[in-house]
Amino acid sequence: MKESVISSFDYLKSMTSFDPKTPQYMVNFLKKSEHYCIGVIDIVNSSEISSLLTTKELEKYYGSFLNIMAKIVDQNRGFVIKNIGDCLLFYFPNFAETQTNDKFINCLNCGLKMTEIHSEINQYFKEIELPPINYRISADYGEVSIMKTNFSPNIDLFGTPVNRCVKINHLAKQNSMIIGRDMYRIVKKNADFAYEKIGNYAVNTRFAYPVYSVRKYSNII
C-alpha cells in the first residue's frame, strides 16, 4: 500500500514538471512576480445581443470591437493578454510606486480613450447594419504571477489584481471607467483626472474594497 502511494506521488510530481517539448499542454510560472496595472473591458448585455445576430454577424461585431480596443491598448503602450469571450484583458508592465507614474497615466488614458470612442464605434456599426454596443472598463494595480505555456509564446497573468479587476467591472456605468483602491492611491494626486468614489466591492463579510470612477478633469469644467 505504501509503495502504491509513493508511486502515485512520484507519478503526479512528474506530471507537474514543465517540459516545453511535450505535445501535451503544460504551464510554467516564472520565478519572479511583477507589479502590473491590469485593465478589463467588457461588453454590456452581450448574451442578448448574441441571440439576435447570425454567426457571421457575431464574428464581425465582436471582431471589430476587440480589434479596435486592442489597437487603443497598443497606442497607449499596453499589451493585450487575451480575450475571454467578449471581454478583453490587458496590462501595463513595470509598475512600481517608487518609479514615475507615466505608465499609470497611460493606463488611465487608454481606458478613457475607450470611453471617448463609443459614439464613433456605434456610428460605424450603424453603417454596417450592426446593433449599437455598450461596455464597461475597469483597472487596478498590484502584484501578479506570470505564466507561460508550451503552446504559446504569450504570457498570462494570475493574481488578486486580475481577479479584482474582473469582479469590480460591473460597478462601472455603461461606457465609463472605474479603478480600484490600490490604483487610486497612486494616481489620486494627478490633477489631470477627477475621481469619485462610487461604491465598494464586497470581498467578504469583513472587507469592502473601494472603487472610483475616473474622468478627464478638462471634461468637467
Regions found by a protein language model. Name each.
Residues 77-103, 121-160:
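Catalytic core of nucleotidyl cyclases, primarily class III adenylyl/guanylyl cyclases
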Residues 140, 160-185:
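Catalytic/regulatory signature loops of cyclic-dinucleotide turnover enzymes
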Residues 66, 70, 112-122, 169:
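Structural signal for well-ordered, non-membrane alpha-helices
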Residues 25-106:
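Catalytic NTP-binding/metal-coordinating core of nucleotidyl cyclase/transferase enzymes
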Residues 61-65, 110, 114, 161-164:
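Hydrophobic alpha-helical membrane-association signature
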Residues 1-25, 174-221:
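Intrinsically disordered, glycine/charged-rich C-terminal tails and inter-domain linkers
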